[in-house]
Amino acid sequence: MEDIIKPISKELLKAELTEDKRLRMTNKSNNQIYIITHLNAPNVMREIGRLREIAFRAAGGGTGLSMDIDEYDTMEHPYKQLIVWNPEAEEILGGYRYLLGTDVRFDEKGAPILATSHMFHFSDTFIKEYLPQTIELGRSFVTLEYQSTRAGSKGLFALDNLWDGLG
């Protein structure tokens, strides 16, 4: 098992969390929702990978790597990362990885390139009629400091803020 990477500096994170990546404020707790990829915010992506690995290991999972980042996070047309940022504490509360059905790419055999592709057979009918109206969500996490069992009132709205970002 690899050691988890050190936290990314708050200055680097703030420099990448620019207005053009901000979706909006949350409905509760005055946090901010951002959408990033490794292409436009590589340091934020590394911090997401670090926080995911910490959260997943604490729940008995994890990749065993220094951070939880895979090919779906780093491919040419990557999954997007929706995160909740606490501007007061200058830290990420949690996040989701997602891909809209309209953004799905296909391999040379015509199969959709999705994190769940190995789990399902997608029929031609599904791909043509339903996939464009879907969203694949995955790798959701709430940082340990904001999990309600550990954080008390600090974590009260963390999950709500994440769902707020999903709409």
Please report, for each region that a protein language model flagged, where it lies by residue.
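Acyl-donor binding region in acyl/amide transferases
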Residues: 103-167
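Short beta->alpha transition motifs characteristic of CBS
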Residues: 96-102
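Short amphipathic alpha-helix that is part of the acyltransferase structural core
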Residues: 25-70, 81-94
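Residues that line or immediately flank small-molecule/substrate-binding pockets and catalytic motifs
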Residues: 63, 100, 144
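Intrinsically disordered, low-complexity boundary segments flanking structured domains
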Residues: 16-23, 68-69, 120-128
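Conserved N-terminal entry element of GNAT/NAT acetyltransferase domains
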Residues: 2-39
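A short helix-loop-beta-strand connector motif used in the catalytic cores of GNAT acetyltransferases and
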Residues: 72-83, 106
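Short, well-ordered loop/turn elements at secondary-structure boundaries
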Residues: 77-79, 88, 92-93, 130-132, ...
